[in-house]
Structures are given as structure tokens and as C-alpha cells.
Amino acid sequence: MKREVSKVEKALTALLAMHSGSGKAPIGTPALLIVTLVYLGLMLSVAPEALARLLWFALYPIVMAPVVGEQYGRVFVRSLAVLPFVILIGIFNPLYQTEVAFRIGSVTISRGWVTFMSILVRALLSVQALLLLVDSVGFAGLCSGLRRIGVPALLTTQLMMVYRYMTVLLQESLDMTRARQARGYRGRNMSLSMWGTYCGQLFLRTVARSERIHRAMLARGFNGSMPVLAAGEVWNRRDTVTLVAVTCVFALFRWGPLPALFAFG
């Protein structure tokens, strides 16, 4: 059971670290959020067969990672968590798209494999961009930035609530795991029936604690919105210049006459 505790503790620590972020965002939160949205929009609009052009967009997370105080290798490893889902989505492309895309010596690469790789690259780059955004401004900053660019308060409040209650769920899970270890179950696997009891008790404990938190919020004047999400940095000239410059670079990646990184696409 020691291994399970370690996983829960690591997940809880990572989730709590997401609240405020590193605080090393090079520009204001709304501007960085818009930059990320522009990046995702232009990157995802690249044709599936244009894999060489798509690879140029990998420069953004590689350059952005050290700017916000992160190591790109760590961000890349974290983004690999989506690979099983992406592979499940695109693995059948080579079976349906059998047209020849290019040849490497005597090896023929079909169009299906190119589009499959394109799906993988898009997913990894999208997750890496979002990870860098959250790591730099934090989840609270992200919700505040969404609020400032016009996203309805109801949605930003719901996002913040989901994040808060995820920490509640993990904290209750950690407490139950420690209580089980204290009663002599260290290192022993749980049976299926015990897992059912564990999940049921975890649900009941989480709901009960959530109700206590909600009553405490109401006692402090909560009216459905979080005032802290409406606050944020003042937009300045640096944000405007950076947004325009980075957008031009992304537009160059998308439509410019760039040389191919590889001999295909």
C-alpha cells in the first residue's frame, strides 16, 4: 500500500502546485491566454498531411519552457499521458488511407501513417502548450484570465469549483489510505469487495466535506461568483507588442514559405 500512498501524495502535491503557478509568466495572464489560444488555433488548422509545417510549431513549447522556469523534457514527459487516448483515435488511419505519401529508400509510407503522426504531434503540442500556461499562471490565474477576456462568470466559477473539489477528493483519499495503513493493512492488496467499500466511503466523505465547505462559503457571503477571479493585471504595452509579435511568428509557421524540417509534407 506504500506505493498507492506515494501516488496519491504526488497527485495531491501536483494539484496544489497548480493553484498559483510559478509566477514567471513573461506577460500578463490575459495576453498569455490569448497567445495560447492563437497558437492552438493556427497549429490545429494545419492540414493533416502537412506534417513538416506542423513540426515548426514545436518551437513554441521548446522556447517557452525555460522562459516560465520549466524544463522542456519534464513537460514533454508529462504530455505523454495522453498518448494512449490519441493512439486509440488515430490507429485506424493507416488501414483506411493507403495512398502513398512518400518513400524513404525502398520503404513506402502511406498517407494514413502521415495523418496518424500528425494527430500524435497535434495532441502532444496542445497538451504541452496548456501545461506551460497553467504552470506559469496557475489555475486560479487561468480562470481569472478567462474571466477578463469575456468568458461568462458561471463557467469560470465552475472550473474553479471543480479544481477545488478535486483537491478535496484527493485529500480524503489520502486520509483513508493512511487510516488503512495504521490498522495493519500495509502492503496488502484490497479485494474487489473492499475496493467497492473504499470507493463508496470515499464518495460519502467527499460529499459530506463538500457540503461543509459550501456552508462555510455561504456564511462568508458567497453569491455564486468569486470576486478574486475578476481581479488581474492591467493590460500594458508590453502585452500588446508581445501578442502581435508572437502572432506574426505563428502566422509565419502556418502560411509562410518555411523550409521543411524533413523531406516530406
Which residues does each predicted region cover?
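Membrane-helix interfacial "entry" motifs
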Residues: A25-G28, E70-R74, R103, V107-R111, ...
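Generic hydrophobic, aliphatic-rich segments that mediate packing or membrane embedding
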Residues: A58-L59, Q71, I87, A129
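Transmembrane alpha-helix interface motif
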Residues: M1-V68, Q171-G265
